[in-house]
């Protein structure tokens, strides 16, 4: 039923996918540009060690961002493209059969599943940091009225990734067949 619904709104989904791709590419280009600009402009000129006041998330953005980019490439290549191009092994194979394949790039493959879990945790951390940094930038963490948004970012950081990870673990433990 869900697949039928998504098929009926496919043009809207395509627009959303293009928008998401644009945002991701813009974010990557901006992050690389800002990283190099900041290193060039502030090479050893600060008297206070920035790592003393910055979070682990903030200090590891380049690592998590690289892993997330690799995740997107793998996910798009193996799962999204396989489904979109109808690269099924036979006519009776479904989208779920594709996910369950025990081949590199698919969720039935243990090393791929482990990588997906790690990547999902990095995505969660990356998003939590982004939301909290944006709230902090606009001064919305000081006012108790806005603290619920700050706390909500932690809640989202925990629940949504666990739902995705539970799917991967269910595939690996044979609950989803």
Locations of regions flagged by a protein language model:
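Membrane-embedded alpha-helical bundles that constitute the cytochrome b-like, heme-associated redox core
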Residues: 1-177
């Amino acid at each position: 039923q869900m697949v039928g619904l998504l098929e009926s709104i496919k043009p809207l989904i395509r627009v959303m996918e293009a928008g998401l791709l644009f945002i991701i590419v813009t974010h990557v280009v901006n992050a690389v540009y800002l990283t190099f600009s900041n290193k060039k402009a502030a090479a050893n000129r600060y008297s206070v060690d920035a790592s003393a006041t910055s979070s682990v998330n903030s200090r590891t953005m380049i690592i998590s961002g690289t892993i997330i980019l690799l995740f997107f490439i793998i996910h798009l290549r193996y799962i999204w493209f396989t489904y979109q191009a109808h690269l099924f092994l036979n006519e009776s194979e479904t989208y779920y059969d594709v996910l369950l394949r025990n081949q590199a790039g698919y969720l039935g493959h243990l090393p791929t599943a482990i990588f997906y879990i790690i990547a999902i945790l990095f995505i969660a951390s990356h998003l939590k940091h982004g939301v909290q940094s944006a709230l902090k930038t606009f001064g919305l963490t000081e006012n108790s009225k806005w603290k619920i948004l700050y706390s909500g970012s932690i809640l989202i950081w925990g629940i949504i990734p666990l739902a995705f990870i539970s799917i991967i673990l269910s595939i690996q433990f044979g609950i989803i067949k």
